[in-house]
């Protein structure tokens, strides 16, 4: 037990730091959206207690006894040659404990390789893989806590790295009020093996709070998630554009001051699920930060919005999501849940 505590502390301390956004951390595949339902809700929904294994990888404290025997298979045909998928399984242990496991892959495909002079010298492959083991413990009728342990492996050509990370979660659920709140600390850990000797990089540590509310007589559930609370200022300015001028305002980009409302909204993901009976859900969400970072200034389009639906047919639960990241196109997410 003492050895376990020492290991966890040694992994936590390097993670409790700020400024890990905008490409300054490694293994961002740890933040990939594990299911179509999560993707439809803006990439962040963590406070729904309805025994759906699609949410277990995001919040381990949502694993419950009704998930026992559930299997989830997810697939996304992402941008360029990248695609990723996820498989998960949940099991009831006893009156207090439940567990789940998942396996994630991200395949980037073959890429052209060039030398320092720009000559094509062949191709190389890149991929990422994560094994997650999670458990939940029911404290009382209102509170459940959970833990995910994730082992991550990535390779780029001849370079590879291994990382170990933990997610800690707690969920408060009051069914009579239709209210749920969740608290998550994600990706607490460190690299066990670095890509290059002596170059240790940070994992994408994150603190989230999420709430959902379902009005008693309305077939809708509202979701609000505050993400990346470990860092207030999530605005991003490209350091390579030190003298760039905004074509609309004429301001120097690096001199731009972000307003309080803009900084606040970069933490917020809001969405809703329309519950059309027990077998159909229509989902939609808006991710403000995604729109600000990926939408074009003069033609943002639908960047930041995501939509989807869930359909139960006998023993199968099908989910689909269309997440719009950029004017270049959306990503289509598919998930299938069934029991064995």
PLM region spans:
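Positively charged n-region of N-terminal signal peptides that target proteins for export
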Residues: 1-4, 141
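Subset of outer-membrane beta-barrel
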Residues: 18-340
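Bacterial N-terminal signal peptides
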Residues: 4-15
